[in-house]
């Protein structure tokens, strides 16, 4: 059963999933702002129980301690990055399947190699900028988890993730500044999602929004770019970040599995709806409207074509390769008459449900392991 127009309006702010006008109406109006303030509405919790009663979290904590790396000394920052040459080599990945032939009859139909190369550079700059902003969101949310989670084991692990996230913001900011010559402001859809995650007072919603949804999509997106790029610094940077990121997603799976099994159907329905809203917002941000605007193209002319592009559709579906099996592991897909399963069927991403969940898979991402057996 599909959700009604009223339900969609209440959750997404629009009656139809692919309402282009509604998607594009959400823009970042304060592009010159340096700071953004969000109320976090949560209590800090001390615990006087210092027993380590969750072996899976203890194992994760130990792996985090030995898996640390130095962003300054462990990456080859001396690498010279030729933007135009790199874009030409990585064009398929950079344009995410968008080709000139697909835009026959539009302004892009007249684009030559120069314009498509410029688009590729801007697309990479935009993608890495959103990674950077998302990592700062993770930095803030994980610091919140340290404060709000009631378990000693979880506080210990979350503290290591705070350090990881600081390192991730550092490497993306440095790469954008030194190798790509600048960055983009945060996409409005991503900012709204981060605001909702920080604003919610319930500690498990911070986990769900950040560890499962944002970090889960990031892990898949990093894997896609790491697999496609031939640029050695970026390839190594992403590989190192992924080794941390997999632990972060596993942290969410291992923690929430314990919590959700005892929740009522009403409580689970709230989590299902939040997961769906987060999924749609993350999908919407990959329309790259800021890139099209910078290239002098009206996004309203191109977004309908993006939504119909089969190669773009495959790319966007792959971004959910981690989220869907993890939601299944948490029991979110099939509670309440399979409500979330039906939403993911409508989004065309349910095919990933039987992939290995990150709570089991994370060890395959450790530095020194090959990624050949990991599904991106």
Q: What kind of region is each of these model predictions?
A:
Residues 237, 249-259, 276:
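Helix-loop elements that line ligand-binding/catalytic pockets
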Residues 174-246, 270-281:
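Active-site-proximal alpha-helical scaffolds that flank and shape metal-associated catalytic sites
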Residues 1-141, 147-155, 178, 182-185, ...:
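Terminal targeting/low-complexity segments that flank the catalytic cores of oxidoreductases
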Residues 129-132, 136, 159-162, 166, ...:
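Short amphipathic alpha-helical segments with heptad-repeat character
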Residues 134-141, 168, 214-221, 248:
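Amphipathic, well-ordered alpha-helical segments in soluble domains
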Residues 151-181:
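Carboxylate/His-rich catalytic cores and anion/metal-binding grooves
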Residues 139-145, 159-160, 219-225, 237-240, ...:
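A structural feature that tracks compact, well-ordered secondary-structure segments
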């Amino acid at each position: 059963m599909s959700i009604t127009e009223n339900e969609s309006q209440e959750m997404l702010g629009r009656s139809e999933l692919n309402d282009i006008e509604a998607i594009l109406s959400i823009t970042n109006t304060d592009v010159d702002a340096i700071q953004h303030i969000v109320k976090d509405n949560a209590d800090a919790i001390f615990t006087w129980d210092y027993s380590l009663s969750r072996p899976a979290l203890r194992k994760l904590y130990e792996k985090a301690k030995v898996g640390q790396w130095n962003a300054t000394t462990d990456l080859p920052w001396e690498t010279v990055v030729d933007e135009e040459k790199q874009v030409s080599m990585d064009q398929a990945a950079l344009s995410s399947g968008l080709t000139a032939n697909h835009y026959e009859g539009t302004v892009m139909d007249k684009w030559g190699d120069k314009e498509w190369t410029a688009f590729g550079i801007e697309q990479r700059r935009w993608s890495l900028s959103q990674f950077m902003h998302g990592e700062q969101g993770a930095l803030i949310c994980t610091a919140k988890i340290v404060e709000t989670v009631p378990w000693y084991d979880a506080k210990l692990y979350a503290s290591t993730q705070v350090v990881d996230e600081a390192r991730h913001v550092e490497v993306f900011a440095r790469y954008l500044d030194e190798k790509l010559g600048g960055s983009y402001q945060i996409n409005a859809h991503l900012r709204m999602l981060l605001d909702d995650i920080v604003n919610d007072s319930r500690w498990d919603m911070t986990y769900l929004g950040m560890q499962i949804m944002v970090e889960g999509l990031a892990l898949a997106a990093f894997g896609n770019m790491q697999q496609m790029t031939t640029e050695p610094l970026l390839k190594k940077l992403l590989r190192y970040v992924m080794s941390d990121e997999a632990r972060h997603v596993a942290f969410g799976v291992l923690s929430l599995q314990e919590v959700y099994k005892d929740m009522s159907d009403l409580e689970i329905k709230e989590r299902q709806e939040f997961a769906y809203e987060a999924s749609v917002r993350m999908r919407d941000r990959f329309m790259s409207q800021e890139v099209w605007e910078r290239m002098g193209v009206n996004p309203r002319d191109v977004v309908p074509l993006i939504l119909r592009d089969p190669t773009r559709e495959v790319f966007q579906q792959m971004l959910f390769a981690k989220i869907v099996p993890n939601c299944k592991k948490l029991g979110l897909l099939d509670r309440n008459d399979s409500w979330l399963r039906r939403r993911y069927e409508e989004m065309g991403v349910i095919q990933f449900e039987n992939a290995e969940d990150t709570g089991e898979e994370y060890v395959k991402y450790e530095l020194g392991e090959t990624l050949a057996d990991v599904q991106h």
